[in-house]
Design a protein with these regions (language model features):
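Short loop-beta-helix segment that forms the pyridoxal 5′-phosphate
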Residues: 125-153, 201-204
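Short Gly/Ser/Thr- and Asp/Glu-enriched loop/turn motifs at secondary-structure junctions
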Residues: 133-134, 394-399, 443-449
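A short linear hydrophobic-aromatic micro-motif
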Residues: 135, 388-392, 436-441
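Active-site C-terminal subdomain of aminotransferase-like
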Residues: 239, 258, 283-388
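Conserved PLP-binding catalytic core of the aspartate aminotransferase-like
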Residues: 391-431
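PLP-dependent enzyme catalytic core of the Aspartate aminotransferase-like
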Residues: 441-511
């Protein structure tokens, strides 16, 4: 069976796809994120496995129409929800080229050019971190893999025999630390590494939602006294819920004092390194032993494009290197085999999209993007401060805003967590109902919030104003009273327009 087509058919199908992609990109400034609520019907696909083929042009047209017309479009400029960006067009071209060439990055002898491009991209970003001497690292599928790999490196660094002999050789329970707001991939990693999820010590946060360093040090002392083995502290640069950035210099001092590995999860926030104006927000990141960074967040890369960066190439190699008799070993003095510096084995070339975008647009394009999105978020914050309905529930550090409704008609002392959670979920449901825009719910330091963020490079002031108008309209339609018209209630009753719909309950964060 020949899966190829003749040149004429290949060109026809390629042009057909390019036409769809071009129309899609051209529509993104005003394209709705998803169909309206009444049209979101997604029955299971029940067709049988095809025994014979169909016309490729018809099949391609059908799936393009289905995905574009009925899909959920995170590239839309109106997508103001999670950390999912509008991809650059150069990234789309890079992904197409990689799919065609299919380089295998496990072994250097079969990926010399691809591996050189990847190593160069790693070096570029590592130098932005502040590591001028031999920054090393590898592309990953995202922050989950990068954090898992960093914890494996930390174990290898602190307990050199653990990779060969296992956790039992340590002789005591290894423990590591992160804030209550740190990413939940750390819990998953603790389980996958065999540490057990209880090995992750979640430390409370301060008023700025940063890891509380006093309580961190107290927890370390307590664990040492009980015979446990602290091996890593994870500082977060840009939490998912609020964008908070931990105090990296102070955490580094604690790491130095107790000889503990410092990992910075900068999956989102480390992108500020591309901005001279804002890189100070992650001051001290150069002191980290390893860094997680996801270009598929703020750098507008399509999935998957994660990075694990380190200033300890020897520990990276010690953690992941294995002898493999059926693969040729990379010659001494050249680049390492990627399988020996990564949790992955066979893998695609995830670096080309970032490399190509940087070659075409340069660092300064990202600097302009980051600076502009910070200005949009700051303007949004000022609107919230003057809003009749909302207030900020957390400091705005990066282009993420946490909104708390204050115009409920319920006295603050009687507005419990459940009521607030349901009201917020109802507002989100109302804002998202027509499909034009999309925002999300979150829980920040145990409190329900409405979460919005600026992530698309296409988002402008007009998109923010549209969201603001929609938020106000949602409050009005739900019967919420503006602060100037608030009437105290005797009992915490739900506003008249708030319905306990299944969607609202589903969207409500835990109270």
């Amino acid at each position: 069976m020949n899966f190829d087509f003749d040149s004429q058919t290949r060109r026809k199908l390629g042009y057909q796809l390019i036409e769809v992609v071009d129309r899609f990109f051209a529509s993104l400034a005003d394209r709705p994120v998803q169909p309206a609520a009444e049209d979101r019907i997604y029955p299971p696909r029940l067709s049988r496995l095809p025994e014979t083929g169909e016309d490729p042009a018809q099949v391609l047209d059908q799936v393009c129409c289905e995905l574009v017309d009925n899909g959920f479009h995170v590239p839309s400029a109106h997508y103001l929800g999670m950390m999912n960006p509008t991809p650059t067009y150069m990234a789309f071209l890079a992904e197409s080229l990689v799919a065609a060439l299919n380089p295998q990055l496990a072994s250097l002898d079969r990926s010399q050019t691809a591996s050189r491009i990847e190593a160069e991209t790693v070096r570029w970003v590592g130098e932005l971190v502040g590591w001028r001497t031999a920054p090393s690292g590898t592309f990953t599928t995202g922050g989950n893999e990068a954090n898992l790999s960093a914890l494996a490196m930390a174990l290898s660094a602190q307990f050199p025999g653990v990779i060969e002999n296992g956790l039992a050789s340590i002789g005591a329970q290894p423990v590591f630390y992160a804030s209550m707001e740190a990413h939940h991939s750390l819990d998953k990693s603790a389980g996958m590494l065999g540490l057990g999820r209880k090995a992750l010590r979640r430390i409370p946060v301060n008023e700025r939602l940063q890891l509380n360093v006093q309580q961190l040090e107290a927890a370390i002392k307590e664990d040492l006294e009980s015979g446990k083995k602290p091996f890593c502290i994870v500082a977060t640069a840009g939490t998912t819920s609020s964008g908070a950035i931990d105090d990296i210099p102070r955490i580094h001092e604690i790491c130095r004092r107790y000889n503990i590995w410092l990992h910075v999860d900068g999956a989102y926030g480390a992108a500020v390194l591309f901005s001279n104006r804002h890189r100070g927000l992650v001051q001290g990141i150069e002191q980290a032993d390893s860094v997680t960074f996801d270009p598929h967040k703020w750098l507008a890369m399509p999935f998957a494009a994660g990075l694990l960066l380190t200033r300890h190439p020897e520990i990276l190699g010690r953690t992941f290197s294995v002898a493999c008799p059926y693969l040729q070993k990379a010659p001494a003095g050249t680049l390492p085999d990627n399988r020996n510096i990564s949790a992955q084995w066979s893998r695609r070339m995830n670096s080309l999209k970032l490399w190509l975008t940087l070659r075409v647009h340069g660092r300064r394009a990202y600097e302009r993007l980051i600076d502009r999105q910070m200005r949009l978020a700051q303007s949004f914050s000022r609107w919230v401060a003057n809003s009749e309905y909302f207030e900020l529930a957390a400091p705005q550090v990066l282009p993420i805003l946490n909104l708390r409704v204050r115009a409920t008609g319920i006295p603050p002392q009687k507005l419990d967590a459940l009521h607030a959670s349901i009201i917020h979920a109802s507002i989100i449901e109302e804002v998202n109902r027509d499909g034009q825009r999309w925002i999300s719910a979150a829980t920040v330091n145990g409190e329900s919030v409405i979460r919005t963020m600026v992530i698309s490079y296409l988002t402008e002031e007009r998109h923010i104003k549209d969201l603001q108008a929609s938020l106000v309209a949602a409050c009005s339609s739900l019967g919420l009273e503006s602060k100037s018209n608030r009437v105290p209630a005797e009992q915490p009753m739900m506003p008249s327009g708030v319905q306990l719909t299944p969607a609202a309950l589903e969207n409500a964060p835990p109270a």
